[in-house]
């Protein structure tokens, strides 16, 4: 094969690729403009207290029934302050405002629920342990102290720190959950 035939073959392959890219671009633009022209536009009635002077809902234009739900959510959330994109959040005022007795009652209810869940599991077991004189002791699962915590002095050049992660689980669980995680860093 000569240089000319190789160059012509390369040029033809390059031309075919370019034509395919242009065809994909034309199809994409056609779909975009077809979607804009086919939509029906309706004005959303204003529900502002000022009679619609500064109503953001009147400026919103709906196009499809599917979009109506999304725009309705935007209109409903106009007065909601922006939340930071960080997982760590402060506790809500409701949680801070609850008296200490209510918190203790809530904790006692949670413990009762845990104990109720454990009792049916143990009810199915045979009574051999009671016959032998042994007692069943319900112990809560706690973290055992690690070797590092039991040492009197820390290792040289190692820093231990405790990190608290607070996760907001949304509307389903209104109180944020916090988890502690320990890690060590070498200097």
Swiss-Prot record:
Chain segments carrying region Disordered: 99-153
A GO cellular-component term linked to this record: membrane
InterPro entries in the record: DUF4642 (IPR027813)
The keyword Transport is assigned to this record: no
Residue ranges with Polar residues bias: 137-149
Keyword Kinase: no
Disulfide bonds: none
Bilayer topology: Single-pass membrane protein
Highest taxon of the lineage: Eukaryota
Location in or out of the cell: Membrane
Transmembrane segments: 8-28
Keywords carried by this UniProt record: Membrane, Transmembrane, Transmembrane helix
Name of the protein: Uncharacterized protein C2orf74
Organism name: Homo sapiens (Human)
Gene assigned in the entry: C2orf74
